[in-house]
Amino acid sequence: MAAKQPPPLMKKHSQTDLVSRLKTRKILGVGGEDDDGEVHRSKISQVLGNEIKFTIREPLGLRVWQFVSAVLFSGIAIMALAFPDQLYDAVFDGAQVTSKTPIRLYGGALLSISLIMWNALYTAEKVIIRWTLLTEACYFGVQFLVVTATLAETGLMSLGILLLLVSRLLFVVISIYYYYQVGRRPKKA
């Protein structure tokens, strides 16, 4: 007796199956734009770690500001770590330093933030750039408040402190400006 042949396999034509085509397009990330202009990310790009990049030009001067911020944070951090007395003297004009440890800890924290700033300079991911700009704005805002409170307690006022306060306010404004510019949705043409 001859062995029975199994029935031939039926091939599914996914090209004609609409549900299957939709699933395939969703997984591959082909097409799929919603009403707001957002392009849906595919599962593959999520696994590979691709982020939504700038779809238009970056705001004018953003990279220059990121570079200036990274240099500023690094410079002050190194000065606080290596020369805490001179940094304190430059800000508070001749006031005596009682302990160098808090100033050096401040330098270590600034050095950590500066590493984040340097890394953000070389990325095109909007989320990372926005977080670093928000970090800068918060840092400069807190520094402005702390120096203002210190002035109110001690009553010391000098040109150096006034320049520090004005520069911190300016840096907050610039960081917030770029934060919102990077977060803006591109205009549809």
From Swiss-Prot:
Residue ranges of the TM segments: 64-84, 109-129, 131-151, 156-176
Question: By its UniProt entry, which InterPro entries does this protein fall under?
Answer: TP53I11 (IPR028266)
Instruction: Give the chief site where it resides.
Output: membrane
Membrane topology (Cytoplasmic): 1-63, 130, 177-189
> Where is the PTM Phosphoserine found along the chain?
14
The biological process GO terms on file are: negative regulation of cell population proliferation
Q: Which PANTHER family match?
A: TUMOR PROTEIN P53-INDUCIBLE PROTEIN 11 (PTHR31584:SF1)
Protein name as it appears in the record: Tumor protein p53-inducible protein 11
Q: Which organism is it from?
A: Homo sapiens
The gene name reads TP53I11
